[in-house]
């Protein structure tokens, strides 16, 4: 599994596919309203962690980082686990096992 090491921790590279929410604030016809669909999104970067809050799991990722001074992360996302597609859910679980494996 491809990964980077920052601050002594391994962060695996992931590609996550998920469904985003879309909204339209203005007035629209029935036809325009029915045309609203959730777009399929792709996030590429590194898995920071997975956490649970109020019984819901979330995935945190980052795409940019610095190693000078102390570890810091940028281009960060927090995605509800429930909007990930099936393969991305599997990939996150494999990445977590990789992160937790001493090596």
PLM regions with names:
Residues 2-103:
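Conserved RNA-binding domains used in RNP assembly and mRNA/RNA metabolism
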């Amino acid at each position: 599994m491809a990964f980077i090491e920052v601050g002594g921790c391994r962060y695996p590279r992931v590609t996550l596919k998920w469904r985003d929410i879309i909204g339209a604030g203005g007035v629209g016809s029935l036809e325009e309203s029915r045309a609203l669909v959730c777009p399929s999104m792709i996030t590429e970067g590194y898995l920071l962690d997975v956490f649970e809050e109020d019984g819901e799991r979330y995935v945190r990722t980052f795409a940019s980082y610095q190693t000078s001074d102390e570890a810091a992360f940028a281009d960060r996302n927090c995605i509800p686990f429930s909007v990930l597609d099936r393969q991305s859910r599997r990939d996150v679980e494999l990445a977590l096992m990789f992160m937790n494996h001493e090596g």
